[in-house]
């Protein structure tokens, strides 16, 4: 990525909200009783991303409605997933209100997933001469990585973050370039999305086959050379492999647009953001946001790091340690610091 190009961060809103909801204890509530733990975690990650990368613009993409685009190809797509937790569902309108107060564009389109909006903006931004950062926990997004598109991958909770470049994707998949990640999923499938792949072919075998033959198409062309049960499964499930690759391919033609020249961050009103945070009882974060626009009352988090404070642990029977841990949690909440 180049220092001379403008940098834009595109956040997968659904991915980050889900991870925040499960990483932050469900004990945080707005004054009116509405849950806010996912919002608190989302905003912590948002601020750390801003401090680490100092992007020129920020956009958040959300899913909207059922994933019609992929369900038309694969009716059982994500059908096994349970309904969203009501406490998480209730926080989506609230985070969108906060993002609006922050003057952060929200992009979504009926029937399209946030993944495809990230993919579309990645290519549009690249064509506009920008460096793009895609903030998401979904590994299938690695297929979008180029010299000017990196993925900020939230892997465990919100604290374990990797920056995926073409080289790191190649290392992760043992010689597979980003453009071949859909081929990898064509063979391996993706149980979390109900994408079938080929039975019996896991990640190591999928990587090895693609590295050996060069692509899924070439693996299929040489299917007779694949020995044993794996070869039998491959020859019997060629259609599944091709369909799985198609479903796993991130679209770059979602019906969304962004004026990169007119989009910038930070560009928000201190009063509006303070009021929005106050309405949710997240007042401790106000200084951190105000510092982004030169406001008084607190410096930004140290730039360039996603590290979190050391974990405090206390045994259930150790009253003194438990009291100390509770006091530290209370202090961290008051200071607007990360807790998980």
Task: Describe these PLM feature segments.
Residues 131-135, 286, 339-340:
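Short, hydrophobic beta-strand segments that form beta-sheet elements in well-ordered domains
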Residues 98, 124, 276, 331-332:
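Alpha-helical scaffold elements within enzyme catalytic domains, especially in hydrolases
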Residues 2-135, 139-165, 240-243, 249-257:
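Noncatalytic, basic helical substrate-engagement surface that gates or grips nucleic-acid strands
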Residues 92-93, 116-119, 203, 271, ...:
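Residue-level marker for well-ordered alpha-helical positions
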Residues 2-5, 54-59, 102-104, 127, ...:
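Non-catalytic nucleic-acid-binding/docking modules located in mid-to-C-terminal regions
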Residues 107-117, 299-334:
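Charged, flexible boundary elements
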Residues 7-13, 323-340:
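Gly/Thr-rich phosphate-binding beta-strand-loop-beta motif of the actin/hexokinase/Hsp70
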């Amino acid at each position: 990525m180049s220092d001379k190009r403008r940098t834009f961060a595109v956040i997968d809103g659904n991915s980050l909200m889900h991870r925040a909801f499960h990483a932050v204890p469900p004990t945080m509530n707005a004054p009116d009783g509405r849950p806010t733990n996912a919002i608190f975690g989302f905003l912590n990650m948002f601020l750390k991303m801003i401090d680490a990368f100092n992007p020129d613009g920020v956009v958040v993409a959300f899913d909207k409605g059922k994933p019609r685009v992929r369900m038309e190809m694969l009716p059982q797509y994500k059908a096994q997933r349970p309904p969203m937790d009501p406490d998480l569902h209730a926080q989506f309108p609230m985070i969108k209100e906060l993002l609006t107060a922050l003057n952060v564009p929200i992009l979504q389109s009926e029937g399209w997933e946030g993944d495809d909006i990230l993919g579309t903006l990645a290519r549009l931004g690249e064509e506009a001469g920008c460096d793009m950062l895609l903030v998401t926990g979904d590994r299938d997004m690695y297929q979008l990585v180029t010299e000017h598109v990196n993925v900020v991958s939230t892997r465990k909770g919100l604290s374990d973050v990797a920056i995926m470049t073409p080289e790191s994707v190649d290392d992760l998949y043992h010689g597979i370039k980003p453009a071949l990640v859909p081929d990898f999923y064509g063979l391996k499938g993706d149980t979390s999305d109900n994408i079938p792949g080929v039975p019996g072919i896991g990640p190591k075998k999928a990587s090895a086959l693609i590295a050996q033959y060069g692509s899924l198409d070439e693996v299929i062309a040489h299917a007779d050379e694949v020995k044993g049960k794996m070869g039998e499964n491959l020859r019997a499930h060629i259609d599944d492999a091709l369909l799985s690759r198609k479903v796993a391919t991130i679209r770059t033609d979602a019906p969304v647009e962004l004026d990169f020249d007119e989009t910038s961050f930070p560009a928000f009103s201190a009063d509006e953001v303070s009021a929005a945070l106050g309405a949710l009882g997240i007042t401790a974060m106000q200084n951190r946001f105000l510092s982004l626009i030169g406001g008084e009352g607190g410096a930004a988090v140290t730039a360039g790091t996603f590290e979190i404070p050391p974990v405090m642990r206390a045994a259930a029977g150790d009253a003194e340690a438990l009291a100390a841990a509770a006091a530290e949690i209370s202090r961290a909440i008051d200071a607007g610091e990360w807790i998980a």
